[in-house]
């Protein structure tokens, strides 16, 4: 007696009785132990099964047909005859390309014949780029790929599309399935520097991401840890369900109730992904450019970490670089002009101007809070930067530069205003990119432009010396030469911590050149005559000259591309910061962040003892090593789950249903395969053909089982109403993408362009928060963006296309191993009234009218295009009358709504 049978029987007893809840729990635990004790079919070693003996009536040479025939004989079933050429063409074109065949394809197959022509046709279809475009969409369903974050802040991911193109290329190139899987889990670790492998890690970043939690919650808090655990849970679930068809995430709170997966296994997988985040990741498609960039970046890293050899900084090449650099920097410094005040205002009215160094000295303040302000004439039409220097002075406590008893100051706001003439109103100048040479703890130069009176900039304990703050002036700022500029130094601190002496300067130098000498030692080395510079000063100048030289070389390289993918290194945004290494992962009892237990080491499923974990004995201190080890474990030749899962998915998309009915759950709670030997044989074929997916496609497409008619037979249906033994081909409705792309192809509007950024088939404007406002109806159906294949559409999670949603295009917030196929009034209304369908009907009618003068001829051409057959006399009469009353465009739309068009037999 199998555990599945016991579980179903006991569940039925529970449902029909009124046992206490406690009894139900005890029984559930008992059932889980029965399940765990029985070897799960999907966990058994993958061994090629013996081929069954075909029945006398089975003349096929394809082993697939022998396995299917063997099961049919046991059930008293017989296969259906071969479908017509027309039916087969519509079926295979839709399955492999997601596009309709041409009537010329039917004429060719009729002339060539099935025996010779079918295999040629299959090779042609699998060799076309359209194959990858069709089958990549299936993969995107499984991994819930979309191009926005989802959750409450559904921000767009503008660089997710390279991963989609990676899928299409990989499938078209028939990349070995093991390599395909490994690249998506750890491609960056497999082949460092290889762009294609790096792009593959977009797989781990395909799912939703909680921006508000990741960026808004402070590190180290319980809520942030919960967000990080949940983010890794998405990666674990996607990885294990996609490649192994297991519900590993069910072991997050306790041992899996049905499958041999422990809570320790789950948190070992959490440790594998402990250093992984999602962000835009730069890459170079050209390997030579990549090598140059990496060399320069490595040299920069060594230089900034003081690891670069001093000998390389003091040789003749370095001296030449320093000479060129100091000359160029001097020309930039010459563009800085000190302000000469026209007059002072308010508390600055008693300030004294020092012409020798262009500084202003302010007397001791009479109050704790107040304003220092003065105006001057702008020397430039479009200044690019402004600098505030605070200077020491013997008249100040401890030489200043502030009036505090220790020489410090606390400046609250630094504001700049401009006006073209004395009678014009003042307009505030927008400042950005603040920098300085030093800030007191808890203060910052960026606080000077944050419009917050409570935040300040100070310099304690570095008093008695000069300090600089620098700001870029926004490019949108309009300042005219000869116009007036006003400076305001606002002091809002509770004590009289005013600036005592300072000066302001402006520049109009190019923005990339206007960074001032903020480091005092650099400024001193620069101002020292060359023959008097110490070794330390020479090294200081050489480091900066070399750094600028390398930055220039980097800027000369073509800009890097970007992909939204798994990464451990990125620029911080709010509280979202790179871990720079694996985070600590602890086992959480009941999945509760407040019930942590022992620290977990990276690992996989302990019950699969036949598959070695980390046979190369990597240290696993780097997160990329952990992912690579998991990728190799998952794709191991002895991992039957890996090969069975993919073979099951391929079968599913050719027949409408998988051999094992729950493709993301091959465990005890899922459905066992109807043809276990066939599934194992297909899995072995996939494994032993170097992971060739196209090999499996050919086997299936060339089988008699695939080529059967869809004709319904009462006698067979009484035995097998659900057609699980494949006595006929089950009719299937066109999915959303196939329907849309078919309309484009029939109207001859389908764009042949492949790849590139996703097309936004909607109008978008900023929303109240992060999620934008998206308008699909306002986007004209005649726009060129609408002619691209559906796989190139920009995919929103929370704001999907209403028409595609009505046609059962899946919700990308969740995994979709099998799409729901519904038939209801909403679809009929969408098919009749959607602007895209109306436009495509009009475009097709224009083509028909152009090529055919008479209505009956147009009707015949319409049937050839849409249904691949001649219309009957009754259909010609019906459509001709309808056309005369309602137009040919409406007749096209009428046909698009028919079962004959919507369903593939």
Map each language-model feature to its residues.
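Disordered, acidic Ser/Thr/Pro-rich linker "stalks" and the adjacent N-terminal cap
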Residues: 318-371, 392-394, 417-481, 579-617
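Short beta-strand-plus-loop segments that form exposed binding edges in beta-rich domains
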Residues: 390-392, 488-495
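Sequence context surrounding c-type heme c attachment/ligation sites in exported
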Residues: 190-298, 302, 487, 497, ...
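Extended extracellular/luminal ectodomain segments enriched in beta-structured repeat modules
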Residues: 379-385, 479-486
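Electron-transfer interface patches adjacent to heme c in soluble/periplasmic c-type cytochromes
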Residues: 50-61, 205, 209-216, 220-232, ...
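Post-cleavage N-terminal segment of exported redox proteins
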Residues: 29-52, 137, 148, 157, ...
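Primarily short, surface-exposed interaction patches in extracytoplasmic proteins
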Residues: 56-90, 95-96, 100-130, 145-192, ...
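Short coil-to-beta strand junction motifs in C2/discoidin
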Residues: 398-413, 496-502
């Amino acid at each position: 007696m199998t555990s599945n049978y016991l579980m179903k029987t006991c569940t039925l007893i529970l449902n029909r009785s009124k046992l206490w809840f406690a009894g139900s729990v005890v029984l559930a635990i008992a059932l889980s132990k029965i399940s765990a004790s029985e070897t799960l079919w999907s966990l058994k070693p993958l061994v090629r099964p013996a081929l069954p003996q075909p029945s006398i009536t089975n003349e096929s040479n394809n082993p697939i047909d022998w396995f299917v025939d063997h099961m049919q004989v046991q059930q008293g079933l017989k296969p259906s005859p071969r479908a017509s050429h027309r039916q087969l063409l519509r079926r295979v074109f839709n399955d492999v390309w997601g596009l309709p065949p041409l009537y010329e394809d039917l004429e060719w197959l009729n002339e060539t014949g099935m025996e010779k022509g079918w295999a040629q046709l299959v090779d042609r279809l699998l060799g076309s780029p359209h194959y990858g475009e069709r089958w990549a969409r299936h993969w995107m369903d499984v991994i819930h790929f979309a191009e926005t974050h989802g959750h409450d802040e559904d921000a767009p991911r503008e660089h997710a599309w390279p991963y989609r193109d990676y899928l299409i290329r990989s499938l078209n190139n028939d990349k070995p399935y093991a390599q395909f899987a490994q690249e998506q889990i750890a491609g960056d670790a497999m082949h460092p520097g290889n762009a294609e492998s790096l792009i593959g890690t977009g797989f781990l970043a395909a799912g939703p991401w909680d921006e508000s939690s990741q960026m808004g919650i402070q590190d180290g808090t319980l809520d942030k840890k919960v967000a990080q655990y949940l983010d890794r849970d998405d990666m674990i679930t996607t990885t294990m369900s996609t490649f192994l068809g297991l519900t590993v995430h069910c072991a997050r709170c306790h041992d899996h109730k049905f499958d041999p997966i422990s809570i320790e296994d789950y948190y070992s997988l959490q440790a594998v992904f402990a250093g992984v985040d999602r962000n835009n990741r730069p890459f170079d498609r050209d390997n030579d450019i990549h090598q140059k960039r990496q060399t320069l970046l490595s040299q920069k890293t060594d230089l900034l970490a003081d690891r670069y050899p001093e000998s390389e900084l003091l040789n003749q090449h370095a001296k030449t670089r320093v000479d060129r650099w100091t000359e160029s920097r001097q020309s930039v410094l010459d563009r800085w002009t000190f302000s000469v005040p026209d007059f002072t205002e308010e508390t600055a009215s008693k300030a004294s101007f020092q012409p020798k160094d262009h500084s202003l000295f302010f007397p001791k303040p009479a109050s704790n809070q107040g304003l220092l302000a003065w105006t001057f004439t702008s020397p430039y039409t479009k200044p690019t930067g402004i600098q505030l220097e605070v200077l020491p002075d013997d008249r100040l406590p401890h030489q200043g530069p502030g009036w505090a008893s220790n020489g410090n100051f606390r400046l609250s706001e630094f504001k700049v205003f401009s006006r073209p003439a004395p009678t014009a109103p003042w307009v505030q100048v927008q400042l950005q990119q603040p920098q300085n040479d030093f800030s007191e703890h808890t203060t910052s130069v960026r606080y000077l432009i944050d419009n917050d009176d409570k935040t300040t900039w100070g310099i304690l304990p570095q008093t008695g010396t000069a300090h600089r703050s620098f700001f870029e002036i926004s490019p949108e700022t309009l300042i005219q030469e000869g116009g007036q500029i006003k400076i305001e130094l606002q002091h809002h601190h509770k004590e009289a911590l005013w600036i005592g002496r300072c000066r302001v300067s402006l520049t109009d130098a190019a923005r990339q050149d206007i960074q001032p000498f903020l480091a005092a030692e650099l400024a001193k080395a620069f101002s020292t005559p060359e023959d008097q510079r110490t070794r330390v000063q020479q090294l200081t100048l050489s480091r900066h000259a070399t750094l600028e030289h390398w930055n220039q070389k980097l800027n000369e390289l073509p800009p890097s591309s970007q992909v939204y993918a798994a990464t451990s290194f990125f620029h911080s945004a709010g509280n979202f910061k790179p871990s720079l290494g694996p985070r600590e992962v602890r086992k959480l009892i009941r999945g509760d962040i407040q019930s942590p237990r022992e620290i977990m080491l990276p690992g996989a499923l302990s019950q699969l003892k036949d598959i070695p974990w980390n046979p190369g004995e990597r240290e696993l201190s780097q997160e990329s090593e952990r992912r690579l080890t998991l990728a190799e474990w998952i794709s191991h030749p002895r991992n039957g789950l890996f090969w069975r899962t993919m073979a099951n998915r391929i079968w599913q998309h050719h027949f409408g249903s998988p051999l094992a009915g729950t493709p993301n759950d091959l465990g005890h709670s899922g459905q066992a395969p109807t043809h276990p030997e066939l599934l194992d044989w297909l899995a072995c074929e996939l494994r032993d053909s170097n992971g060739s997916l196209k090999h499996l496609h050919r086997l299936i497409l060339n089988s008699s089982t695939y080529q059967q008619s869809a004709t319904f037979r009462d006698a067979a249906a009484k035995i097998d109403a659900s057609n699980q033994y494949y006595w006929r081909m089950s009719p299937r409705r066109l999915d959303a993408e196939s329907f849309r792309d078919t309309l484009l192809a029939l109207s001859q509007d389908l764009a042949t362009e492949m790849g590139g950024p996703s097309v936004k088939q909607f109008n978008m404007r900023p929303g109240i928060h992060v999620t934008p406002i998206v308008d699909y109806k306002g986007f004209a159906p005649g726009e060129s963006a609408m002619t691209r294949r559906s796989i190139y559409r920009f995919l929103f999670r929370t704001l999907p296309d209403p028409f595609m949603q009505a046609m059962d295009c899946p919700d990308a917030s969740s995994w979709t191993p099998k799409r729901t196929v519904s038939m209801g009034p909403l679809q009929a209304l969408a098919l009749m009234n959607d602007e895209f369908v109306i436009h495509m009907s009009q475009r097709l009618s224009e083509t028909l009218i152009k090529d055919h003068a008479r209505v009956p001829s147009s009707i015949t051409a319409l049937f050839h295009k849409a249904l691949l057959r001649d219309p009957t006399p009754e259909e010609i009469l019906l459509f001709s009358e309808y056309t005369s009353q309602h137009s040919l465009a409406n007749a096209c739309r009428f046909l698009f709504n028919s079962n004959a068009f919507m369903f593939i037999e």
